[in-house]
């Protein structure tokens, strides 16, 4: 789910800010031109990219830049906003939007992109929220929190919102898929709910299915994404067993 927050450039110290290329990725670079004590300066910060559903696996360059400037620049609304409500968090606690449920765990907030648009500086957030929560309620809670803490003129807006795809792990099709994984790997792990979008959105009543094998690093959507050849071969056997069981039931 994509959110945006716009700040008037005149209320900030920035002449220009640019960071991130995709909202659903933790940005690995950010550059800002800003004014301090009558001088114009430029700061560039590097981070580590990560998928937007797991921002904690990266180092957010936008947040790092704002954090570095917080001790240098005063009277800058955008920096004050980050210092008060974003910090280096990924769970939305200081923003007033921290939520969690048993089925899918806590929400994640990825500060995915920042750019200068005309007279505004626009911040974009990739939010992955739990399946039992309503996005409108979360956004209203955030805006109320901002208003109560001196930022009544700053509003979070929804850009896009795709409905959740969720199926209870106890339904027959999930148990069939899970049995194929258990039998082929010997790993008795339970199924996992992920925050990313998959082909399961294409049709009703389907789920994305694939192994997250114990001890393996998750590198999807990151630089140098890879899979062990042995794991790929094992995945083939899992899929083969799963398909046989699905068509025979």
Description of each model-found segment:
Residues 53-118, 137, 153-249:
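An extended, acidic, His-containing surface patch that forms the Zn2+-binding/catalytic region
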